[in-house]
């Protein structure tokens, strides 16, 4: 079974054929999936850039157990827990792939072997996401494994954003991404981490994650706050993906600092340079850097083993996959930080 969006605004569970693996692939039986509040909601609404073919199979945050491997596979073994499994091609079943990770069985590709044999190219049907289809250590349980799909994307962006230990940052938005920047930033060794959100309850969650200060958008826009901040932030991070958010923090970034956008923006964002220092670096991170995302898992697994990072800090809702409509309704109502569904 798999979760299908038959047309924008609709969602259903449909029976499809179990994927047939090739020599470079492993078959994974899904244990748990997680909703990506932004991407999955946009795909359901028909508003994800570049995706306009329906029906499509939904989902890209997946964890499960390897149950079969192709003859050329070296980096997956039966019994391993794997993350990032997808279905890239549904063949003649009349379904397009919106990554297809919300499926009972998914496929992972042995990217390293594909690369060695010169097959890791788009012309050979290789997606960039194959690089981050990996196993996780045995101590990483299903909830941590599936939430790692979010964590590793965020931690993988630290290098792109020029974030180094000790830096002072302010993050706008306290959804799963914004809170991941806070939690992982503290574990990574960033200095002061402040957060901005409209809702006091979300600011309190951010403080529990390690944020030093929480502010509303109105508070950071006052002349008094801007004067007191005195352009002292090494980096400002937009964890929402809106130009109005970037403009709200441009007065806070230091000369030569980093303005970091994590999210998909509209076609023509407008930045008010009158609010910015003469020199700053703008980083647009609308797609993961796969090599950094993959490397981040080693650090995450260590933090999980040490008990310093737990999925329970992020998961607010748990459902069975048959309750997928209820899960998305909760997301739409704004109740969900992170939601997981079991198969």
Regions found by a protein language model. Give the residues of each.
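C-terminal substrate-binding/catalytic core of Rossmann-like NAD(P)-dependent dehydrogenases/reductases
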Residues: 226, 267-317, 325-326
């Amino acid at each position: 079974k798999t979760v299908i969006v038959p047309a924008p605004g609709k969602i259903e569970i449909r029976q499809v054929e179990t994927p047939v693996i090739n020599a470079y692939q492993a078959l994974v039986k899904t244990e748990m999936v997680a909703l990506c509040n932004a991407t999955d909601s946009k795909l359901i609404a028909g508003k994800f850039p570049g995706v306009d073919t329906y029906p499509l199979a939904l989902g890209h945050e997946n964890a499960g157990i390897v149950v079969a491997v192709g003859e050329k596979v070296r980096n997956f073994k039966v019994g391993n827990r794997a993350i990032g499994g997808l279905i890239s091609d549904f063949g003649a079943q009349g379904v397009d792939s919106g990554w297809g990770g919300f499926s009972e069985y998914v496929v992972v590709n042995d990217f390293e072997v594909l690369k060695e044999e010169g097959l890791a190219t788009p012309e050979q049907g290789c997606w960039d996401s194959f690089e981050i289809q990996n196993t996780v250590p045995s101590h990483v349980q299903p909830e941590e494994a599936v939430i790692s799909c979010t964590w590793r994307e965020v931690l993988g962006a630290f290098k792109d954003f020029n974030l180094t230990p000790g830096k002072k940052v302010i993050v706008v938005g306290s959804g799963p991404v914004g809170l991941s920047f806070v939690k992982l930033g503290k574990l990574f060794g960033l200095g002061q981490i402040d957060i901005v959100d409209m809702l006091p309850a979300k600011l309190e969650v951010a403080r529990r994650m390690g944020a030093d200060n929480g502010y509303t958008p109105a508070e950071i826009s006052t002349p008094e706050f801007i004067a007191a901040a005195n352009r002292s932030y090494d980096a400002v991070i937009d964890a929402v993906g809106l130009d109005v958010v970037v403009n709200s923090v441009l007065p806070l970034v230091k000369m030569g600092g980093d303005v970091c956008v994590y999210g998909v923006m509209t076609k023509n964002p407008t930045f008010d340079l009158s609010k910015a220092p003469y020199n700053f670096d703008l980083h647009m991170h609308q797609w993961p850097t796969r090599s950094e995302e993959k490397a981040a898992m080693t650090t995450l697994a260590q933090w999980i083993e040490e008990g310093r990072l737990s999925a329970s800090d992020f998961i607010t809702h748990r459902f069975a996959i048959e309750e997928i409509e209820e899960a998305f309704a909760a997301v739409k109502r704004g109740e969900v930080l992170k939601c997981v569904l079991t198969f």
